[in-house]
């Protein structure tokens, strides 16, 4: 595995389509798609400032790092992602992804985060300002998570929530197969499946 340590990159696609990389103390400055279409990437003590850093990637681990507000829409169309001890300050993270694991992650601005994703595990994390989080997601497991945001889990399927606190009104709209264990939910719950449009008059 190639190591890139104590370096800085910017502009368009500086590490495009690279594989088997270990990044340590690397800064990705303003630009786009720094690691697009990469695979088997490990990033430790890194900072991501440019847009769309991890698009269409397969197999990457992020540890003890920061995705700034500038790294918006940062992780889309990717697979097999693990993130530990990291702050994701970027909006609209995680779209159409398969295989996401988060542990001890802070997401201060989580609005429209986790859309159309599947096979998600989130542990020991905080998701704030997270309206419409987990929309159209499937196979979601949350353990010891605090979530602040309304309209969560719309149209979600196969959701397990354990030891969590959800401050979320109008959650679980049209959701299917939801299990909540040893948790607190503050707000209205809306289970309305099947859809009213499918009911006979």
Segments predicted by a language model, with ranges:
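A generic tandem-repeat structural signature
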Residues: 53-100, 104-116
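Residues in short coils/turns that link rungs of repeat/solenoid architectures in beta-rich domains
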Residues: 11, 29-30, 45, 49-50, ...
């Amino acid at each position: 595995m190639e190591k890139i340590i104590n370096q800085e990159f910017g502009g368009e696609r500086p590490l495009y389509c690279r594989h088997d990389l270990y990044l340590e103390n690397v800064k990705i400055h303003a630009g786009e798609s720094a690691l697009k279409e990469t695979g088997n990437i490990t990033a430790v003590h890194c900072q991501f400032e440019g847009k769309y850093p991890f698009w269409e990637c397969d197999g990457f681990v992020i540890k003890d790092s920061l995705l700034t507000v500038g790294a918006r829409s940062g992780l889309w169309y990717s697979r097999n992602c693990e993130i530990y001890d990291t702050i994701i300050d970027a909006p609209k993270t995680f779209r159409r992804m398969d295989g996401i694991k988060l542990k001890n992650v802070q997401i201060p601005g989580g609005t429209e985060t986790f859309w159309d994703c599947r096979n998600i595990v989130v542990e020991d994390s905080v998701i704030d300002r997270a309206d419409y989080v987990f929309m159209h997601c499937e196979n979601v497991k949350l353990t010891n998570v605090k979530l602040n945001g309304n309209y969560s889990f719309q149209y979600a399927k196969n959701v397990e929530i354990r030891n969590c606190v959800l401050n979320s009104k109008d959650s679980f709209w049209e959701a299917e197969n939801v299990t909540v264990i040893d948790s607190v939910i503050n707000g209205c719950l809306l289970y309305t499946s099947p859809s009213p449009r499918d009911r006979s008059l």
